[in-house]
Amino acid sequence: MVQKSRNGGVYPGTSGEKKLKVGFVGLDPGAPDSTRDGALLIAGSEAPKRGSVLSKPRTGGAGAGKPPKRNAFYRKLQNFLYNVLERPRGWAFIYHAYVFLLVFSCLVLSVFSTIKEYEKSSEGALYILEIVTIVVFGVEYFVRIWAAGCCCRYRGWRGRLKFARKPFCVIDIMVLIASIAVLAAGSQGNVFATSALRSLRFLQILRMIRMDRRGGTWKLLGSVVYAHSKELVTAWYIGFLCLILASFLVYLAEKGENDHFDTYADALWWGLITLTTIGYGDKYPQTWNGRLLAATFTLIGVSFFALPAGILGSGFALKVQEQHRPKHFEKRRNPAAGLIQSAWRFYATNLSRTDLHSTWQYYERTVTVPMYRLIPPLNQLELLRNLKSKSGLTFRKEPQPEPSPSQKVSLKDRVFSSPRGMAAKGKGSPQAQTVRRSPSADQSLDDSPSKVPKSWSFGDRSRTRQAFRIKGAASRQNSEEASLPGEDIVEDNKSCNCEFVTEDLTPGLKVSIRAVCVMRFLVSKRKFKESLRPYDVMDVIEQYSAGHLDMLSRIKSLQSRIDMIVGPPPPSTPRDKKYPTKGPTAPSRESPQYSPRVDHIVGRGPTITDKDRTKGPAETELPEDPSMMGRLGKVEKQVLSMEKKLDFLVSIYTQRMGIPPAETEAYFGAKEPEPAPPYHSPEDSRDHADKHGCIIKIVRSTSSTGQRNYAAPPAIPPAQCPPSTSWQQSHQRHGTSPVGDHGSLVLRLERSAGMMSCH
């Protein structure tokens, strides 16, 4: 009989023969060959079992023991009790106030127990109150140890021991053990022994110390002392020197005559009590030398002994102010953030800007689309109930059963399969708007194995963003079509393919959003200004200093701009190095680059003459300045050249004619001088006025003299310019009369000067 084995082999089998098995050696745990290397690599030994992610052995099977499951309520209670006892806030202070009143009552009763009138009544109440205090403190101590397990560093028995070694926990256990020992050994029929009461008074002090569980008082004191350690050490050192010196000198002066200063220790006691301004009066100097020394060192030493109190007081005040300052500045955080957000929306919602879209997209998501434009009136109530849970996404209602979760169409597919999504994808073409997909087509696309879903890339996101948007005209068209009666409404009642998508914001809605953003910006700005109110005097000083620096910078900028317009640039600019005011390369008054400063224009400050400036070799080659100051400089140069020519002609005339100065002075006194032209320094205007007045006097005096003997020359029309003739030609034309010759010449000069001034 041939039998086929389980492993596929064929061998003759007998009833008494042992069945052979083909396999690996040492796979069974506990087998003799299971300690081989190959066996350990294939199956592993029995001891190290497969662990979880946290390297803990998995507990599988029915017989395996399950670890104790921590309840959520257990953890919550542990955290709650730990916060109440270690970090009290809010109503948790009620318990700590109760403990404080309990300890304070024990302290008051222990004080009354020392008075004979109230000794008996206070001892009984103190006994009961001490028992209550011990019970409360004992329960609180064990609850603290148990609740500390909520912190990871205090978990386990080692963590509990670490928590118990904290200073305040050590004080708690000391007070608890000592109180139990005093009550057990010192009580005799509800009456305390004297030694027990004394020990109990000491325990009251420790109980008051434990009231500050967080140690904030001691931390504050330590920080103040550390911050002002140098000042304190200096004051204590000088005060100690004054104490030693004053005690020693008074001891030498009072040693033989005063019994209170028999030893140097008595003198040190007197010096300490005196310099600390306590003055018990048990010891005092009696000799005049001792009194004089005591008065001198008292005036010096008291000031140094009082310094530490002032240093610590100011240090505490500054530390408290530093602790309150961050709290005051934290109040400015929310107004500042709101101001930044509202300022950006105020900037981004500007209708003239077309490059900012994120803010408008935010409002497109938040603003509700009117439902009555998209929903037929017959299905409005039912769809409104269904659309409450749909926040602006595509919604379809089909008369087919709801598909399973695995067959549900994704948001992306629903958007692109919708007619408006296809319209957005087809860029508004009429062919794309008329295309509609049936649910069967969508299902066939989803079920086809050849279609592999692609990742939703940024391009898809942009396409879905376009698909989510629908123009207001399309929405109004849908509302009009929905309002028309006919067969379409009946078909929509049977199968409503309604879609809910967001629409673009209309211009009116954008204007409304813009107005709201402006109002929010103004309100946020006002709130932020209110939060910037000064906290203390230091804030006021800082604000004034910042404003002063800002004002100085603005004034400096304004001055530099004025100098750039009407004068040379300030020394800090590189333009001043290019055109220096002194040296061989400085521009002269005739150069187009020259322009007077503001003080020179208004007539203040020393005038800069041509002697102070040296003409450069390249002045004539410089291009003309087209600015206002360049043109004014050019006009001034022309006027100066004309003044030089006129001065030359007048000097020749006066020398040739020999006009007496008495006549000119008499005429000058009878005629007021004309005012000086504007935009000139006082020296230039004075010189110009003198020259002009002199010319007028000479001209009018000569013309009046010539009119006595000769007639006036024929008038020349103003449009024509007189011919340029020399002085000899005019002398030969008018004969031998010198006055007439000079009068005609000066008249021509006067007319030519008037025409040039008109030009």
UniProtKB/Swiss-Prot annotation:
Q: Which organism is it from?
A: Mus musculus
Q: What is this protein called?
A: Potassium voltage-gated channel subfamily KQT member 2
Q: Where is this region: Mediates interaction with calmodulin?
A: 317-512
Cell location: Cell membrane
* Family, as annotated: Belongs to the potassium channel family. KQT (TC 1.A.1.15) subfamily. Kv7.2/KCNQ2 sub-subfamily.
Where mainly found? membrane
Compositionally biased intervals (Basic and acidic residues): 609-618
Q: What are the protein's UniProt keywords?
A: Cell membrane, Ion channel, Ion transport, Membrane, Phosphoprotein, Potassium, Potassium channel, Potassium transport, Transmembrane, Transmembrane helix, Transport, Ubl conjugation, Voltage-gated channel
Gene Ontology biological-process annotations: action potential; action potential initiation; apoptosome assembly; brain development; cellular response to calcium ion; cellular response to xenobiotic stimulus; cognition; dentate gyrus development
Q: Write out the ranges of the annotated region (Mediates interaction with SLC5A3).
A: 222-323
Motif Selectivity filter: which ranges? 277-282
Residue ranges within the lipid bilayer that do not cross it: 264-276
Q: What does this protein do?
A: Pore-forming subunit of the voltage-gated potassium (Kv) M-channel which is responsible for the M-current, a key controller of neuronal excitability. M-channel is composed of pore-forming subunits KCNQ2 and KCNQ3 assembled as heterotetramers. The native M-current has a slowly activating and deactivating potassium conductance which plays a critical role in determining the subthreshold electrical excitability of neurons as well as the responsiveness to synaptic inputs.
